[in-house]
Amino acid sequence: MSSYQNHKALAELTLGKPTAYCDYYDATLLQAVPRSMNREPLGLYPDNLPFHGADIWTLYELSWLNSNGLPQVAVGEISLNADSINLIESKSFKLYLNSFNQTIFADKESVRMTLQRDLAACAQGNVSVALYDLDEITGQPISNFNGECLDKQDIRIDSYEFNADYLQGAAGKDHVEESLVSHLLKSNCLITHQPDWGSVQIHYRGPQIDHEALLRYLVSFRHHNEFHEQCVERIFNDIMRFCQPETLTVYARYTRRGGLDINPWRSNTDFVPLTGRLARQ
């Protein structure tokens, strides 16, 4: 159980509660979760964040009406800066997007500007929004994380409770730069405890991290209850704390739920994330 699971900000969320679906635009449906909620227990504060990054959302179920009442569809990509005050709760995001369904907008740019304005106001931070017609993205290849996959190791695991101590002593003497990938990341929603499935790429330069220890650590998230963004920041923080790499990037891409996927990344070096969807997305 996360130390902040009873935080008052969580009690106000619609997540985990019966809700009505609204067909007409309503920005008040968006709900924020303070990033400080999970950062402060990790010793992370706005004036000394050890990383930069973003939460990249893909919107697969976005529709509105044009001026003639004809439904329009697009795929959206949102990038929310990690230094925003709040993250955006995903169920509220879904409800907000549903409120576009029967709302007339003059054109696609009006939809984009509305999304950017509302999301920035909710997150209290910088947001970029891109909307794509379907013919712009049809036929795009499935992407893959570059790096050595950790998942084929012949090891026995019998504990699935989160334990950062797997990384204790995991940093070796050899100095390397490598990318490591696992598709076994699984955590659970902080509120509903529904499973969240993801793939994670860890790129670092520094003392070589023991691959078995790192895989055991990642598998230990299996019963852990935390939002996607919080899990990625926890992974970044734990690797920095125990292994002390010179540079580190953690990038996770989660499978979609409710027409949305969330893909957070955190880094202390130059990094440009590839945003193509993975096989399970």
Curated annotation (Swiss-Prot):
This is NADPH-dependent 7-cyano-7-deazaguanine reductase. PANTHER family: NADPH-DEPENDENT 7-CYANO-7-DEAZAGUANINE REDUCTASE. It is an enzyme of class 1 (oxidoreductase). Substrate binds at residues 88-90, 228-229. Keywords: Cytoplasm, NADP, Oxidoreductase, Queuosine biosynthesis. One of its GO terms (cellular component) is cytosol. NADPH binds at residues 90-91, 257-258. It comes from the Bacteria. InterPro entries: GTP-CH-I_C/QueF, NADPH_dep_7-cyano-7-deazaG_red, QueF, QueF_N, QueF_type2. Pfam families: QueF, QueF_N. Its EC number is 1.7.1.13. Pathway: tRNA modification; tRNA-queuosine biosynthesis. The active site is at 189 (thioimide intermediate), 196 (proton donor). One of its GO terms (molecular function) is preQ1 synthase activity. Homodimer. It catalyses: 7-aminomethyl-7-carbaguanine + 2 NADP(+) = 7-cyano-7-deazaguanine + 2 NADPH + 3 H(+). HAMAP family: QueF_type2. It is found in: Cytoplasm.
